[in-house]
Design a protein with these regions (language model features):
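Hinge/cleft segment of the Venus flytrap/periplasmic-binding protein
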Residues: 38-48, 186, 197-201, 294-349
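Hydrophobic alpha-helical
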Residues: 112-128, 194, 208, 212-275
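Extracytoplasmic "Venus flytrap"
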Residues: 49-74, 78, 82-97, 105, ...
Length: 349
Protein backbone atom coordinates (compact mmCIF):
# COMPACT_ATOMS: atom_id res chain seq x y z
CA UNK A 1 0.00 0.00 0.00
CA UNK A 2 1.35 3.40 -0.98
CA UNK A 3 1.99 5.81 1.87
CA UNK A 4 3.20 9.40 1.83
CA UNK A 5 6.84 8.26 1.84
CA UNK A 6 6.46 5.45 -0.71
CA UNK A 7 8.69 6.29 -3.67
CA UNK A 8 8.00 3.17 -5.71
CA UNK A 9 5.75 5.09 -8.10
CA UNK A 10 6.46 8.25 -10.11
CA UNK A 11 8.29 10.77 -7.95
CA UNK A 12 6.95 14.31 -7.76
CA UNK A 13 8.75 17.39 -6.48
CA UNK A 14 6.94 17.35 -3.14
CA UNK A 15 8.14 13.81 -2.48
CA UNK A 16 11.68 14.81 -3.37
CA UNK A 17 11.52 17.75 -0.98
CA UNK A 18 10.26 15.55 1.84
CA UNK A 19 12.80 12.84 1.09
CA UNK A 20 15.84 15.11 1.00
CA UNK A 21 14.64 17.05 4.01
CA UNK A 22 14.14 13.94 6.13
CA UNK A 23 17.53 12.56 5.08
CA UNK A 24 19.35 15.77 5.91
CA UNK A 25 17.78 15.83 9.36
CA UNK A 26 18.57 12.17 9.97
CA UNK A 27 22.21 12.72 9.06
CA UNK A 28 22.47 15.85 11.17
CA UNK A 29 23.21 18.15 8.24
CA UNK A 30 22.19 21.71 9.06
CA UNK A 31 20.28 23.77 6.54
CA UNK A 32 23.33 26.00 6.21
CA UNK A 33 26.40 23.76 6.29
CA UNK A 34 29.54 24.88 8.08
CA UNK A 35 32.63 26.00 6.21
CA UNK A 36 34.52 22.87 7.21
CA UNK A 37 33.00 21.04 4.26
CA UNK A 38 33.23 22.36 0.71
CA UNK A 39 34.08 26.05 0.41
CA UNK A 40 31.74 28.36 -1.42
CA UNK A 41 32.53 29.48 -4.96
CA UNK A 42 30.78 32.20 -6.89
CA UNK A 43 27.08 32.10 -5.98
CA UNK A 44 27.53 29.03 -3.76
CA UNK A 45 27.62 29.07 0.01
CA UNK A 46 29.76 26.52 1.89
CA UNK A 47 28.11 23.10 1.78
CA UNK A 48 28.89 19.44 2.52
CA UNK A 49 31.30 17.81 0.08
CA UNK A 50 28.68 15.48 -1.33
CA UNK A 51 29.76 12.18 -2.86
CA UNK A 52 28.03 11.07 -6.05
CA UNK A 53 28.42 7.55 -7.43
CA UNK A 54 28.33 6.70 -11.14
CA UNK A 55 27.35 3.14 -12.07
CA UNK A 56 28.51 2.42 -15.60
CA UNK A 57 28.18 -0.50 -18.02
CA UNK A 58 31.58 -0.09 -19.74
CA UNK A 59 33.91 1.43 -17.17
CA UNK A 60 37.07 1.20 -19.30
CA UNK A 61 35.52 2.09 -22.67
CA UNK A 62 37.28 5.09 -24.28
CA UNK A 63 33.88 6.57 -25.11
CA UNK A 64 33.53 7.56 -21.47
CA UNK A 65 36.86 9.43 -21.22
CA UNK A 66 35.23 12.81 -22.00
CA UNK A 67 32.31 11.86 -19.75
CA UNK A 68 34.70 11.36 -16.85
CA UNK A 69 36.39 14.67 -17.61
CA UNK A 70 32.93 16.23 -17.45
CA UNK A 71 32.36 14.59 -14.07
CA UNK A 72 35.71 15.81 -12.76
CA UNK A 73 35.13 19.35 -14.01
CA UNK A 74 31.66 19.51 -12.46
CA UNK A 75 32.95 18.13 -9.15
CA UNK A 76 35.69 20.75 -9.07
CA UNK A 77 33.25 23.53 -9.89
CA UNK A 78 30.58 22.51 -7.37
CA UNK A 79 32.82 21.21 -4.58
CA UNK A 80 31.76 17.56 -4.71
CA UNK A 81 33.45 14.18 -5.17
CA UNK A 82 32.58 11.14 -7.27
CA UNK A 83 33.15 7.41 -7.54
CA UNK A 84 33.28 5.53 -10.87
CA UNK A 85 31.94 1.98 -10.59
CA UNK A 86 30.01 -0.71 -12.45
CA UNK A 87 31.07 -3.30 -15.03
CA UNK A 88 33.67 -3.47 -17.77
CA UNK A 89 31.55 -5.74 -19.99
CA UNK A 90 27.91 -4.70 -19.52
CA UNK A 91 27.30 -7.28 -16.79
CA UNK A 92 23.98 -6.19 -15.29
CA UNK A 93 24.57 -8.20 -12.11
CA UNK A 94 27.85 -6.39 -11.47
CA UNK A 95 26.16 -3.06 -12.05
CA UNK A 96 23.30 -3.79 -9.67
CA UNK A 97 25.81 -4.91 -7.03
CA UNK A 98 27.72 -1.64 -7.48
CA UNK A 99 24.49 0.32 -7.12
CA UNK A 100 23.62 -1.53 -3.92
CA UNK A 101 27.07 -0.78 -2.52
CA UNK A 102 26.47 2.89 -3.26
CA UNK A 103 23.14 2.72 -1.43
CA UNK A 104 24.61 0.85 1.54
CA UNK A 105 27.42 3.40 1.68
CA UNK A 106 24.85 6.21 1.76
CA UNK A 107 26.02 7.96 -1.38
CA UNK A 108 24.58 11.46 -1.68
CA UNK A 109 23.37 10.77 -5.21
CA UNK A 110 23.60 8.07 -7.88
CA UNK A 111 23.87 8.26 -11.66
CA UNK A 112 23.33 4.93 -13.42
CA UNK A 113 23.28 3.84 -17.05
CA UNK A 114 20.03 1.87 -17.08
CA UNK A 115 20.78 -0.73 -19.73
CA UNK A 116 18.13 -3.23 -18.56
CA UNK A 117 14.37 -2.67 -18.39
CA UNK A 118 13.82 -4.18 -14.95
CA UNK A 119 17.08 -4.95 -13.09
CA UNK A 120 17.57 -1.42 -11.77
CA UNK A 121 13.97 -0.73 -10.78
CA UNK A 122 14.13 -2.09 -7.22
CA UNK A 123 17.50 -0.55 -6.24
CA UNK A 124 16.39 2.77 -7.71
CA UNK A 125 13.20 2.69 -5.63
CA UNK A 126 15.20 1.73 -2.54
CA UNK A 127 17.64 4.61 -3.04
CA UNK A 128 14.79 7.07 -3.39
CA UNK A 129 13.11 5.72 -0.26
CA UNK A 130 16.34 6.50 1.59
CA UNK A 131 16.47 10.01 0.19
CA UNK A 132 19.26 9.33 -2.31
CA UNK A 133 18.45 11.06 -5.61
CA UNK A 134 18.97 8.89 -8.70
CA UNK A 135 19.34 9.94 -12.33
CA UNK A 136 20.04 7.80 -15.37
CA UNK A 137 22.59 8.76 -18.00
CA UNK A 138 23.60 7.41 -21.44
CA UNK A 139 20.90 4.72 -21.23
CA UNK A 140 17.40 4.85 -19.80
CA UNK A 141 14.89 2.24 -18.68
CA UNK A 142 11.90 4.43 -19.43
CA UNK A 143 8.71 4.67 -17.39
CA UNK A 144 9.30 1.39 -15.57
CA UNK A 145 12.15 2.97 -13.62
CA UNK A 146 11.48 5.73 -11.09
CA UNK A 147 14.76 7.59 -11.61
CA UNK A 148 14.27 11.34 -11.34
CA UNK A 149 15.59 12.25 -14.80
CA UNK A 150 17.53 10.99 -17.82
CA UNK A 151 20.60 12.73 -19.22
CA UNK A 152 21.61 11.48 -22.65
CA UNK A 153 20.66 11.07 -26.26
CA UNK A 154 17.08 10.26 -27.22
CA UNK A 155 18.15 6.86 -28.47
CA UNK A 156 15.11 5.83 -30.50
CA UNK A 157 14.86 9.21 -32.24
CA UNK A 158 18.56 8.97 -32.90
CA UNK A 159 17.96 5.59 -34.51
CA UNK A 160 15.26 7.06 -36.73
CA UNK A 161 17.65 9.72 -38.02
CA UNK A 162 20.40 7.14 -38.36
CA UNK A 163 18.08 4.96 -40.43
CA UNK A 164 16.98 7.91 -42.55
CA UNK A 165 20.63 8.62 -43.37
CA UNK A 166 21.12 4.98 -44.37
CA UNK A 167 18.13 5.26 -46.70
CA UNK A 168 19.72 8.33 -48.32
CA UNK A 169 22.98 6.48 -48.91
CA UNK A 170 21.80 3.02 -49.96
CA UNK A 171 19.38 2.50 -52.83
CA UNK A 172 18.75 -1.22 -52.35
CA UNK A 173 20.42 -4.49 -51.45
CA UNK A 174 21.84 -6.03 -48.30
CA UNK A 175 22.69 -3.81 -45.33
CA UNK A 176 24.18 -5.04 -42.07
CA UNK A 177 23.63 -3.32 -38.73
CA UNK A 178 26.22 -4.19 -36.09
CA UNK A 179 25.46 -3.95 -32.37
CA UNK A 180 27.73 -4.89 -29.46
CA UNK A 181 25.06 -6.09 -27.03
CA UNK A 182 21.58 -6.65 -28.49
CA UNK A 183 18.73 -5.83 -26.13
CA UNK A 184 20.67 -3.48 -23.89
CA UNK A 185 19.03 -0.09 -23.62
CA UNK A 186 22.09 2.04 -24.36
CA UNK A 187 22.09 0.88 -28.00
CA UNK A 188 19.10 -1.37 -28.85
CA UNK A 189 16.69 1.60 -29.29
CA UNK A 190 18.97 2.89 -32.06
CA UNK A 191 18.57 -0.37 -33.95
CA UNK A 192 14.80 -0.25 -33.40
CA UNK A 193 14.60 3.29 -34.77
CA UNK A 194 16.82 2.49 -37.75
CA UNK A 195 14.76 -0.58 -38.67
CA UNK A 196 11.54 1.45 -38.51
CA UNK A 197 12.98 4.22 -40.68
CA UNK A 198 14.24 1.78 -43.30
CA UNK A 199 10.94 -0.11 -43.34
CA UNK A 200 8.93 3.10 -43.66
CA UNK A 201 11.05 4.21 -46.63
CA UNK A 202 9.66 1.41 -48.78
CA UNK A 203 13.07 0.83 -50.34
CA UNK A 204 14.21 -2.69 -51.24
CA UNK A 205 16.83 -2.73 -48.49
CA UNK A 206 17.30 -6.05 -46.72
CA UNK A 207 18.62 -5.52 -43.19
CA UNK A 208 20.44 -8.05 -41.05
CA UNK A 209 21.36 -7.25 -37.43
CA UNK A 210 24.64 -8.80 -36.22
CA UNK A 211 25.85 -9.00 -32.60
CA UNK A 212 29.55 -8.17 -32.26
CA UNK A 213 30.35 -8.43 -28.53
CA UNK A 214 31.93 -6.04 -26.05
CA UNK A 215 35.63 -6.24 -26.93
CA UNK A 216 37.07 -4.14 -29.76
CA UNK A 217 39.06 -7.06 -31.23
CA UNK A 218 36.03 -9.35 -31.00
CA UNK A 219 33.85 -6.75 -32.70
CA UNK A 220 36.23 -6.34 -35.61
CA UNK A 221 36.59 -10.11 -36.05
CA UNK A 222 32.83 -10.59 -36.33
CA UNK A 223 32.46 -7.68 -38.73
CA UNK A 224 35.25 -9.10 -40.90
CA UNK A 225 33.57 -12.52 -40.87
CA UNK A 226 30.27 -10.97 -41.91
CA UNK A 227 31.91 -9.25 -44.87
CA UNK A 228 33.66 -12.46 -45.95
CA UNK A 229 30.31 -14.26 -46.04
CA UNK A 230 28.45 -11.45 -47.81
CA UNK A 231 30.81 -9.75 -50.23
CA UNK A 232 27.96 -8.28 -52.27
CA UNK A 233 26.63 -6.25 -49.36
CA UNK A 234 25.73 -2.60 -50.01
CA UNK A 235 26.08 -1.12 -46.53
CA UNK A 236 27.77 -1.67 -43.16
CA UNK A 237 26.58 0.42 -40.23
CA UNK A 238 26.98 0.20 -36.44
CA UNK A 239 25.19 1.59 -33.39
CA UNK A 240 28.07 1.63 -30.88
CA UNK A 241 31.57 3.07 -30.86
CA UNK A 242 33.57 -0.16 -30.91
CA UNK A 243 31.53 -1.68 -33.73
CA UNK A 244 31.75 1.56 -35.72
CA UNK A 245 35.55 1.47 -35.45
CA UNK A 246 35.43 -2.18 -36.56
CA UNK A 247 33.35 -1.25 -39.60
CA UNK A 248 35.85 1.50 -40.42
CA UNK A 249 38.77 -0.92 -40.22
CA UNK A 250 37.11 -3.51 -42.46
CA UNK A 251 36.00 -0.96 -45.05
CA UNK A 252 39.53 0.48 -45.14
CA UNK A 253 41.24 -2.92 -45.32
CA UNK A 254 39.18 -4.12 -48.29
CA UNK A 255 38.80 -0.70 -49.97
CA UNK A 256 35.06 -1.17 -50.00
CA UNK A 257 34.22 2.47 -50.59
CA UNK A 258 35.65 2.14 -54.10
CA UNK A 259 33.16 -0.67 -54.67
CA UNK A 260 30.21 1.47 -53.64
CA UNK A 261 29.75 0.17 -50.09
CA UNK A 262 28.40 2.83 -47.72
CA UNK A 263 29.22 2.85 -44.04
CA UNK A 264 28.74 4.81 -40.82
CA UNK A 265 27.97 4.64 -37.15
CA UNK A 266 28.33 6.30 -33.76
CA UNK A 267 30.84 8.02 -31.49
CA UNK A 268 34.20 9.65 -31.90
CA UNK A 269 36.94 7.07 -31.53
CA UNK A 270 40.13 8.30 -33.25
CA UNK A 271 40.22 5.61 -35.98
CA UNK A 272 36.57 6.32 -36.73
CA UNK A 273 37.28 10.03 -37.23
CA UNK A 274 40.36 9.33 -39.35
CA UNK A 275 38.34 6.95 -41.53
CA UNK A 276 35.78 9.69 -42.15
CA UNK A 277 38.53 12.13 -43.14
CA UNK A 278 40.05 9.51 -45.45
CA UNK A 279 36.70 8.79 -47.10
CA UNK A 280 36.12 5.26 -45.80
CA UNK A 281 33.13 6.13 -43.59
CA UNK A 282 30.25 8.39 -44.60
CA UNK A 283 29.47 9.62 -41.09
CA UNK A 284 29.50 9.07 -37.37
CA UNK A 285 27.13 10.50 -34.76
CA UNK A 286 28.29 12.58 -31.79
CA UNK A 287 26.13 12.32 -28.64
CA UNK A 288 28.33 14.65 -26.52
CA UNK A 289 29.60 12.34 -23.76
CA UNK A 290 31.16 15.26 -21.86
CA UNK A 291 27.65 16.49 -21.06
CA UNK A 292 26.62 12.99 -19.98
CA UNK A 293 29.19 13.31 -17.20
CA UNK A 294 28.93 17.00 -16.31
CA UNK A 295 25.15 17.34 -16.22
CA UNK A 296 24.35 14.48 -13.81
CA UNK A 297 26.73 16.03 -11.26
CA UNK A 298 25.13 19.44 -11.85
CA UNK A 299 21.62 18.08 -11.39
CA UNK A 300 22.39 15.92 -8.36
CA UNK A 301 24.25 18.82 -6.78
CA UNK A 302 21.33 21.22 -7.23
CA UNK A 303 18.92 18.63 -5.84
CA UNK A 304 21.06 18.47 -2.70
CA UNK A 305 21.95 22.16 -2.50
CA UNK A 306 18.33 23.34 -2.81
CA UNK A 307 16.86 20.60 -0.62
CA UNK A 308 14.92 19.31 -3.61
CA UNK A 309 13.48 22.64 -4.77
CA UNK A 310 15.42 22.26 -8.02
CA UNK A 311 14.74 18.69 -9.11
CA UNK A 312 16.65 16.84 -11.85
CA UNK A 313 15.13 17.25 -15.31
CA UNK A 314 15.32 15.15 -18.47
CA UNK A 315 18.07 16.49 -20.74
CA UNK A 316 18.72 15.41 -24.34
CA UNK A 317 22.45 15.69 -25.06
CA UNK A 318 21.72 15.78 -28.77
CA UNK A 319 22.72 14.27 -32.08
CA UNK A 320 25.29 15.68 -34.47
CA UNK A 321 26.34 14.06 -37.73
CA UNK A 322 30.10 14.22 -38.26
CA UNK A 323 31.01 13.88 -41.94
CA UNK A 324 34.02 14.54 -44.13
CA UNK A 325 32.82 18.13 -44.46
CA UNK A 326 33.00 18.93 -40.73
CA UNK A 327 35.36 16.31 -39.25
CA UNK A 328 38.52 18.46 -39.27
CA UNK A 329 38.00 20.21 -35.89
CA UNK A 330 37.49 16.82 -34.23
CA UNK A 331 40.87 15.68 -35.56
CA UNK A 332 42.89 18.84 -34.94
CA UNK A 333 41.48 20.07 -31.63
CA UNK A 334 42.97 18.76 -28.38
CA UNK A 335 40.41 19.26 -25.64
CA UNK A 336 38.91 17.67 -22.54
CA UNK A 337 35.48 18.14 -24.07
CA UNK A 338 36.14 15.40 -26.62
CA UNK A 339 38.53 13.38 -24.46
CA UNK A 340 41.61 14.10 -26.58
CA UNK A 341 43.49 16.05 -23.89
CA UNK A 342 43.61 16.24 -20.10
CA UNK A 343 44.51 19.92 -20.18
CA UNK A 344 42.11 22.77 -19.45
CA UNK A 345 42.56 25.39 -22.14
CA UNK A 346 40.68 28.41 -23.43
CA UNK A 347 40.19 29.21 -26.19
CA UNK A 348 39.85 25.62 -27.31
CA UNK A 349 42.27 24.80 -30.11
Amino acid sequence: MNGPDDLSGPLDRAQLLRSLGVTAAALGIPASADAGAAPGSGFLEPHPRWRFVFVNHATTNPFFVPARYGIQDACKHYGTTYQWSGSRRSDVGEMVAAMRRAIDGRADGIAVSVIDRTAFNEPTAEALRLGIPVVSYNADGGLGNTRLAYVGQDLYQSGLKFGARIVELVRDGDVFLFIATPGQLNIQPRVDGALDAIKDSGKAIRVTVVATGTGVAEERTRIEATYQRHKNLRGMFAVDGGSTQGVADVVRKHRLRGRGVRAGGYDLLPRTLRSIADGHLDFTIDQQPYLQGFLPIFQLFLARYTGGLVAPADTNTGLHFVTRRNVRPYLTTRTRYEGSSRIHKYPVS
